[in-house]
Amino acid sequence: MEMKAVCVLKGQGPVEGTIHFVQKGSGPVVVSGTITGLTEGEHGFHVHQFEDXTQGCTSAGPHFNPLSKKHGGPKDQERHVGDLGNVTAGKDGVAIVSIEDSLIALSGDYSIIGRTMVVHEKRDDLGKGDNEESTQTGNAGSRLACGVIGIAQ
């Protein structure tokens, strides 16, 4: 059975986008979409714990981490479930998102439905930095835009 989800990203500034998620059975989740209004370069891209948007993207809480692991890159064994690495924006400020991830899911224990997708100000160092913040957030900086992930047709 195929499941689909969608997330509309919005923030205080010009950054916005739409992200689509598709999962067939227990296979990997295919994440695709477009984010506009970014500065050129890499930006951290994570699923955060909560659906709470009462204080903008800040109230989305930490990265989705049901396994209580340290922050890492999407290909690492040691990573939060919500660690999807970086998206890269060109000179035009547009990032084309194309990710396939086997840890997130659209149902079950690692379901991202009802959680918040966040795009960050800076590059995610994938937990390879030399400070404590690297093992928690990847030093990705402030939250530029976010949106709740919901079930789609």
UniProtKB/Swiss-Prot annotation:
It is found in: Cytoplasm; Nucleus. GO terms for biological process: reactive oxygen species metabolic process; removal of superoxide radicals. Disulfide bonds join 57-146. Its main location: cytoplasm. This is Superoxide dismutase [Cu-Zn]. The gene is SOD1. Binds 1 copper ion per subunit. Binds 1 zinc ion per subunit. PROSITE patterns: SOD_CU_ZN_2 (PS00332). GO terms for cellular component: cytosol; mitochondrion; nucleus; peroxisome.
